[in-house]
């Protein structure tokens, strides 16, 4: 019985994480990225100015280990060189979904 309950919990956890990734709004993420991220990163085709020492969003999306879920968690607590924006979980998920939409 305990193993059966454990299996059900695992299935529900996977399903809820998948549905939250599917619920992310890449269009809203693009808007947020252009507003908050474009001063450092190239966030869209045709963008002319960004910092040269940071990856473009397209290059992040092309990484073999790219994961929208991992990126969204990272955005909630970024590395020290990156400004700390007050992103909600939804906003972080939306930006990550936008970056994921840039995958070839």
From Swiss-Prot:
Changing residue 60 to F: In strain: CC705 / UW505. Its main location: periplasm. Pfam families: Cytochrome_CBB3 (PF13442). Keywords: Electron transport, Heme, Iron, Metal-binding, Nitrogen fixation, Periplasm, Signal, Transport. One of its GO terms (cellular component) is periplasmic space. Residues 1-23 form the signal peptide. GO terms for biological process: nitrogen fixation. Heme c binds at residues 37, 40-41, 82. Transmembrane segments: none annotated. It comes from the Bacteria. InterPro entries: Cyt_c-like_dom, Cyt_c-like_dom_sf. Changing residue 27 to E: In strain: CC705 / UW505. Binds 1 heme c group covalently per subunit. Coiled coil: none annotated. Disulfide bonds: none annotated. It is found in: Periplasm. One of its GO terms (molecular function) is electron transfer activity. Changing residue 25 to N: In strain: CC705 / UW505. Changing residue 68 to P: In strain: CC705 / UW505. Monoheme monomer. Has the tendency to dimerize. Belongs to the cytochrome c family. This is Cytochrome c-552. It comes from Bradyrhizobium diazoefficiens (strain JCM 10833 / BCRC 13528 / IAM 13628 / NBRC 14792 / USDA 110). The lineage of its organism: Bacteria, Pseudomonadati, Pseudomonadota, Alphaproteobacteria, Hyphomicrobiales.
């Amino acid at each position: 019985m305990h193993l059966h309950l454990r299996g059900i919990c695992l299935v529900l956890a996977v399903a809820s994480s998948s549905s939250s990734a599917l619920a992310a709004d890449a269009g809203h993420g693009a808007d947020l990225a252009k507003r908050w991220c474009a001063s450092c990163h190239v966030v869209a085709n045709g963008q002319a100015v960004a910092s040269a020492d940071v990856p473009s969003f397209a290059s992040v999306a092309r990484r073999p280990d790219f994961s929208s879920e991992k990126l969204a968690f990272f955005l909630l607590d970024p590395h020290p060189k990156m400004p700390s924006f007050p992103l909600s979980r939804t906003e972080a998920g939306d930006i990550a979904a936008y970056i994921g939409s840039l995958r070839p």
